[in-house]
Amino acid sequence: MERRRRPTLEMVAALAGVGRGTVSRVINGSDQVSPATREAVKRAIKELGYVPNRAARTLVTRRTDTVALVVSENNQKLFAEPFYAGIVLGVGVALSERGFQFVLATGRSGIEHERLGGYLAGQHVDGVLLLSLHRDDPLPQMLDEAGVPYVYGGRPLGVPEEQVSYVDIDNIGGGRQATQRLIETGHRRIATIAGPQDMVAGVERLQGYREALLAAGMEYDETLVSYGDFTYDSGVAAMRELLDRAPDVDAVFAASDLMGLAALRVLRASGRRVPEDVAVVGYDDSTVAEHAEPPMTSVNQPTELMGREMARLLVDRITGETTEPVRLVLETHLMVRESG
């Protein structure tokens, strides 16, 4: 049987009745082609089953049409925390709509950062989405030195806002909403399991908790504050610490659903009923909260939208549609369930 010849650019041009250069312009997304011609070329591509040569296209456009989503955590944390799933989904959808693909990379140690920096600066990608950064992360400086555009997922700590593009969640507002809910339901010994203080989400959710207490005329008491890193295990340790220091606690705001789930289980193991003895509010509004026992009240943050907006800002930067830094902050809302 004769093997079918692989379709070429010239074959597409002949079928569409246009020149080779016109086909290239359509493939590369140029706006210098009439709508009718563009449709004719697309029909020819579909009919022939033509697949553009990405390597050749890269030589012409000087782009790979690929971006990296870099999560500055280890793999275990990436796949354990529900927050990241929504981000990845939103990024993937938005990039696909613009004809881009992405690679997912993680790294937290110095060696991992060095390896990542070398890869990202090596013209393998057109830009980078940075997620879950800590205060000491070297990746932004590496990208600046290499001239690689990037967008932060979350407002960066210690960086002048006017110099960078980012998409963030209103973490202060979310922390405030959670704490106000506990105040409004009559609780007075309200503790919090805060997130890491080298990350903006951890800092700002704690700030929202504090602001809500002070606005209600209540004291901010350090003995009612313990810290975790958003993981389940850290939530277990933090809740036990709170009960040791303040056994009369009657409510807990946990800065992630996993830490909230940990609080629920530690409270149950200690003989306390939720919400009758101690109310609990989490943060993420993930399936973890929905399927907890009892179902957990939680702050909803639009992670899929966050991923979409991060991708949109980066592609706009890559294609030259925007050159100035853009900053977006997305709103949160409280999903009330049985735990508090």
From Swiss-Prot:
Pfam families linked: LacI (PF00356), Peripla_BP_3 (PF13377)
SMART domains: HTH_LACI (SM00354)
Compartment list: Cytoplasm
UniProt-recorded Gene Ontology molecular function terms: DNA-binding transcription factor activity; transcription cis-regulatory region binding
Organism whose genome encodes this protein: Thermobifida fusca (Thermomonospora fusca)
Gene3D superfamilies: 3.40.50.2300, lambda repressor-like DNA-binding domains (1.10.260.40)
Effect seen on changing residue 55 to T: Decreases binding to DNA and forms a less stable complex with the celE promoter in the presence of cellobiose
Domain of life the protein comes from: Bacteria
Keywords: Cytoplasm, DNA-binding, Repressor, Transcription, Transcription regulation
Primary location class: cytoplasm
Keyword Cytoplasm in record: yes
Description of what induces expression: Constitutively expressed.
Protein name from the UniProt record: HTH-type transcriptional regulator CelR
Function of the molecule: Transcriptional regulator that regulates the expression of all six cellulases, encoded by the cel genes (designated celA through celF). Acts as a repressor. Specifically binds to a 14-bp inverted repeat site, which is present in the upstream region of the cellulase genes.
Activity control mechanisms: Activity is controlled by cytoplasmic cellobiose levels. Binding of CelR to the celE promoter is inhibited specifically by low concentrations of cellobiose, the major end product of cellulases. Activity may also be regulated through post-translational modification.
DNA-binding region(s) in UniProt: 9-28
GO cellular component: cytoplasm
Ranges where the HTH lacI-type domain occurs: 1-61
